Amino acid sequence: MTSQDRRITKTRKAIYTAFLQLLNQKNFESITVQEIIDLADVGRSTFYSHYESKELLLDELCRYLFHHLFEREENISTEAYLTHIFSHFKKNQDHVTSLLFSKNDYFLRQLQKELEHHVYPMVAKDLQVSYPNIPTSYLKHFVVTNFIETLTWWLKKGKSYKEDQVVSFYLDVLEMK
């Protein structure tokens, strides 16, 4: 790694860390680029050479969080996959809780898209067989919103439960177990 690469990495890390720190203190909408650059100790032009806006910084944060989160092995069980997702959220809860609890629209929309794409297909067939008269769009909405609410509850109040227990609660509510 060249010294320039290290400087770029160090600068991006400082901006990212400052942004996360601010997200833990206040909601996204009230954070200014000025606050980010002050806390990161970088210049405005430096910030804008890395990110066009705080929204694109948030987008990168979401992509970073979701990249490993939703990766899965070929023949993994639904329970094991969901346990992996909950474990990942717990491991990254410093980054996630502020976005989740602030009800940040962008973060929630991205999370919903990922859940619709990765989680819903794993439970769709069983739900459609069990509830053939319920529209697919409703079932998808039910699976996704219940996942987000279960995650929110667990991170706020249910920390005494292990990931696999929370997955059991979630699947029991979906009547998948």
Question: Locations of the language-model features?
Answer:
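Basic, helix-initiating cap at the start of DNA-binding domains
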Residues: 1-26, 35
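Amphipathic alpha-helical linker/stalk segments
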Residues: 21-24, 31, 61-85, 96-97
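Short hydrophobic/aromatic patch on the recognition helix
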Residues: 41-50, 147
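Append "Primarily bacterial transcriptional regulators
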Residues: 15, 34-39, 47, 89
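Amphipathic alpha-helical packing segments from all-alpha helical-bundle domains
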Residues: 105-149
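Short amphipathic alpha-helical segment with a characteristic S/N-K-E followed by hydrophobic residues
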Residues: 15, 30, 42, 53-58
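Helical hydrophobic small-molecule/effector-binding pocket
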Residues: 77-123
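C-terminal peripheral helix-coil segments that are non-catalytic and often amphipathic
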Residues: 87, 153-177
